[in-house]
Amino acid sequence: MANEKIRIRLKAYDHRVLDQSAEKIVDTAKRSGAKVSGPIPLPTEKSIYTILRAVHKYKDAREQFEMRTHKRLIDIVNPTPKTVDALMRLELPSGVDIEIKL
């Protein structure tokens, strides 16, 4: 796997869990001898939902809810087979979405 790059995108609603997962991935990759770039914080996606609190009229009585999606990017340059194997066996929390591109 010479001159290749693994790009890992992490998404989560809780930034603390996301940072812990990114740190685990970076430590695992560095221990196996690969060069790591990141974690790079990407822009946070914010979704706002507005609903009416009243049942019939009263348009002034509204409530807003927001959902923030935090993202991180990690690049692993020149991964060894040992690196790929270690990343496959890594246990991460269930609240983190992982997208891997080779």
Swiss-Prot record:
One of its GO terms (molecular function) is structural constituent of ribosome. It comes from the Bacteria. One of its GO terms (biological process) is translation. Disulfide bonds: none annotated. SUPFAM superfamilies: Ribosomal protein S10. Keywords: Ribonucleoprotein, Ribosomal protein. One of its GO terms (cellular component) is ribosome. Involved in the binding of tRNA to the ribosomes. Part of the 30S ribosomal subunit. Belongs to the universal ribosomal protein uS10 family. This is Small ribosomal subunit protein uS10. It comes from Exiguobacterium sp. (strain ATCC BAA-1283 / AT1b). The gene is rpsJ.
